[in-house]
Amino acid sequence: MVVPELQAANFGGDYDNFTYPRYALDFALVRVYEHGKPIQSPYNLKWKTKGSVPREPVFVAGFPGSTNRLNTYSQFVFNRDIFYPFMLRRINSMLMTARRYSERGPEQSRRALDDILNDENAKKSLIGEYKGLMDKTIETKCRQNENELRQRIASDPELAGLHGNAWETIDRVVQKQAVIFKEYTATFSTPLADIAFSIIRYALEKESISPTSAGTDKSADKKTPEKPLAADKTVKKELLEELRAQSLSPTAIALDYEEVRLAGELEFLLSELSAGDPFVRSMLGEGSILRAPADVARDAIRGTHLTDIAFRKTLLDGGRKAIERSTDPMIVFMRKLVPLWLEREEYHRNNIQAPLAVALEKIALARFAVYGKSAYPDANFSLRLSVGTVQGYSMNGTLAPSQTTLYGLFDRALSFATSDVASDFILPARLAANREAPQRDRIPLATPVNFVTTCDIVGGNSGSPLINRNLEFVGLVFDGNIESLSGRFVYNEEAGRTLCVHPTFIIEALRKLYNAGNTADELEGIKSIPLAPETKPSDSKPSEKNLDKVPEKRSGTVDEAKPPRNMVRAP
């Protein structure tokens, strides 16, 4: 229904991302239809335009993605010394590739914008989390918590017999994980590479269900993997549907950008792995020499027909035999790599993930036996309710207020107007024009824009409603401040804050910027939901595309449900 323009939702760009004070109109409204009519549900939150007041108790209801607060100390060290440094190098490489491509011209800049916003967001998030790992106070707390639990278990013979060896198991597995980490993460992702992988995987899984339906060409490439990844038939059927949908997705693909991205991915992996690594040899090897990543990417992209959905369908319908006989350069290229991917994933699943899961379950059971419900579990995308208060905090030797206003937004725009980064702080066009409107149609400069609470959130909470004790909607969660990023490992109530869009700003924008007064009336309960749509949902095309800051999507906290492209979350 309503989506603000990018400059309104992303005001301040990467400079203001994960910061506060903040001035973002970051929201989206959609209407849910049932049987062709707007759904009329009795289950809803009453909208409170005035929002909340300082020190008022508030609650965030949402699905936080994941945290690592209950990790063992050896896992903490692995993340600090291996995982995060590697992922930061990787995101820097991805960001550099996208930026270089965007400098080629306006159209290239447009194509790369989503990836740049995504990667900038991911990088800033990773840096904030990494700083938490480097914080000696957090490290000490992690070690102390583990020692206390182990002592409590050791003092109970029954618990010690059931769970006492779990830490030693994790220590051994993490040491093994550190050795193979780079090899396991030797993957890459581009639109065409993903399509090729899905097509090849589809053929393998389909044949594993009906061995006689595809057949194999004995003279074909013997490197096509024999083992499918999924074992359960029900899982396989669901996987087949997903792989086929991914393979036939009508995604727009710019071949020149695809080539640059693939070359960048291969270049990074070459820099991280040894020249003799089997994956590197399969990617770049030609006899006894290694080809340049740019040359390999060029040959794989420029002759491919995978941009043609009909061609993809032919490969899917042809099964494994069609894959093995295909001369399409991208299929040939990926056909060499899929066996190694599946082999390494199987090894990791059996030798890292499985023993870790068993040992961590033992520790979780022991923790519950010792602490009961007083120690809540790590975030895992399940529904959680976080309580806090609307409250400012100390920062940079001064105080951050609990809320910002439109005065501050205009001041920030004017303050950067003549700087080198002015483009990130340009006033959104509609908001600038609103200052010239008749007085009654202007948004008052004292209008609250964003505000902060002490609620405990992590990636995945973006878009969660903020409610008060009366179950009234008083804000929309869209980000956390930079101090909150260490919350992946420990909650920081002193300075970690949840950032929310104020409901007053949303209502004022609907009425005075977007000509959506009827929608504002619905939210405020002034009028009821229409019984029939004014226009079909699929017919509406926003005049301006709202590109969220991160993958694939949002502004603010990294969305765990859809992590940044080709990123792996901390183990």
Residue ranges and their predicted role:
Residues 1-571:
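Terminal presequence/propeptide segments associated with secretion/organelle targeting
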